[in-house]
Amino acid sequence: MTHSVEDIKSTSRRLRGSLEQSLADPVTGALREDDQTLIKYHGSYQQDDRDIRDERRRQKLEPAYQFMIRTRTPGGVISPSQWLALDGIATRYANHSLRITTRQAFQFHGVIKRELKATMQAINATLIDTLAACGDVNRNVQVAANPLRSQAHATLYADAARVSEHLLPNTRAYYEIWLDEERVSGSGAEDEPIYGDRYLPRKFKIGFAAPPHNDVDVFANDLGFIAILREGQLLGYNVSIGGGMGASHGDAETWPRVANVIGFVTGDQLLDIATAVVTTQRDLGNRAVRKRARFKYTIDDHGLDTIVAEIERRAGFSLQPAQPFAFAHNGDRYGWVEGEQGDWHLTLSLPAGRIADTDTAAHLSGLRAIAQLQMGEFRMTPNQNLVIAGVPAEQRAQIDQLVAQYGLDAGNLAPTALARGAMACVALPTCGLAMAEAERYLPDFSAALQPLLERHGLAQTPIVLRLSGCPNGCSRPYLAEIALVGKAPGRYNLMLGGDRRGQRLNTLYRENINEADILAALEPLLARYAAERDRHTDEGFGDFLHRSGLIALPPYPTHRHLDLELLA
């Protein structure tokens, strides 16, 4: 019998279900159906290798079940020792690779069921956990990865960690199932003051941004905190609500949305406002139709003013007026940069966030060698790249030698700025929702675009490119200047017109087309951009498309862009 997600949550005994029995079943590599939902809250998804699914079916074998495990690493900061431990886990239990996500977490792929518990224990031994990395709860909290402003970053990171801890599910299930914590009387009846019996209607995402950099794409988050800095001092945060990327092809009842800025709070009000926002979504969100369950639809269905008033009522105070701020871009800066405290930070471009040893670069081995130096820290960026941070000036040469030896700067040396900054979700072969390739197709598509960019003198012009294997939008494609959203194998929707700041949604330009048609559609647009763009303002491709009337805002019924006058 198939149970609804809401029923599974409410009867799970605080996320326990029958997970222990599923894990102990030697007959199958899969979990029981209800437990496949519950394990998400513990930080894992059951998947199978879709490349060999048909062959296994012909052989009358069950699918090649495996598990993806995602870490909870608020702000994406870990120590060299933790890096080495995670590297060892990837080599021993997973598919010999690590993957940096767009939310600054790690993903391990290819873990089999009988090694799932040992893998979880190994991760926790590093003082990193996976609780609430997935599921209808608050997910990993993003933080701006700006390495220049060390003091401001430290404050943002600390605040994000506070919010992350505060919004964790209150259950011992995780520790009982994975870490063999002794069960006590009343297990399964813990008080859950924030989430209640049914948790949230859908996933919930929070990001902390530090203007002028919007690397977290804060307006794609359900709840955003935009740091207001004056002369290096953090005054507090502007609050934004209602962002979200997911949609369904051809369904006018679903759409991506850019968040609204609703006011300003001080640092000591963070937990109260976060709790108020989350519980408002808990109680008012749509639990009957999951595709309409995200917070963005709650806002659109009830009205922004109604939701803001409810948030203020629950918080016990009124929001102050939003403070002026401005974003310049949402990308990363590659290579070495000097921090405000005199140390140095090296940003490496990692295509689609994949860390593995390949024919072109030995990222897994090379980063292991750097971690063994035990200096600084590793910071994952929301653009799936990596910052080796806090390097003393006298040790830069040692890092440079390892970078050259292992080819770690292969991404930094990509022939186009577009390729250096592109993002893609995992998609095939492991994601069950993927309709087309994304991560595996990104290098080929970037290479196919290269001649067009070079022909028009745009090779070193930053253009935001993102690929997604399905319309759920894990790579935040709807904010990109150019996006491919998978429709079927080898076919994509071409979306155009986002901007470099993460403030405007793009628009469907061509539907369900192949690579040749995509390139043919882009050629005349890139030619006009090269010839007619405003070079005095460094006009972006998406901005040019709108100024020239070549594209309009998308026809979604609600918030499609952030009004620039709010940023004055």
UniProtKB/Swiss-Prot annotation:
One of its GO terms (biological process) is hydrogen sulfide biosynthetic process. NCBIfam families: CysI (TIGR02041), PRK13504.1 (NF010029). Gene3D superfamilies: Sulfite Reductase Hemoprotein, domain 1 (3.30.413.10). Its cofactor is siroheme; [4Fe-4S] cluster. HAMAP family: CysI. It is an enzyme of class 1 (oxidoreductase). Keywords: 4Fe-4S, Amino-acid biosynthesis, Cysteine biosynthesis, Heme, Iron, Iron-sulfur, Metal-binding, NADP, Oxidoreductase. Binds 1 siroheme per subunit. Binds 1 [4Fe-4S] cluster per subunit. It comes from Xanthomonas campestris pv. campestris (strain ATCC 33913 / DSM 3586 / NCPPB 528 / LMG 568 / P 25). It comes from the Bacteria. GO terms for cellular component: sulfite reductase complex (NADPH). The keyword Heme applies. GO terms for molecular function: 4 iron, 4 sulfur cluster binding; heme binding; metal ion binding; NADP binding; sulfite reductase (NADPH) activity. Alpha(8)-beta(8). The alpha component is a flavoprotein, the beta component is a hemoprotein. InterPro entries: CysI, NiRdtase/SiRdtase_haem-b_fer, Nit/Sulf_reduc_fer-like_dom_sf, NO2/SO3_Rdtase_4Fe4S_dom, NO2/SO3_Rdtase_4Fe4S_prot, NO2/SO3_Rdtase_4Fe4S_sf, NO2/SO3_Rdtase_FeS/sirohaem_BS. This is Sulfite reductase [NADPH] hemoprotein beta-component.
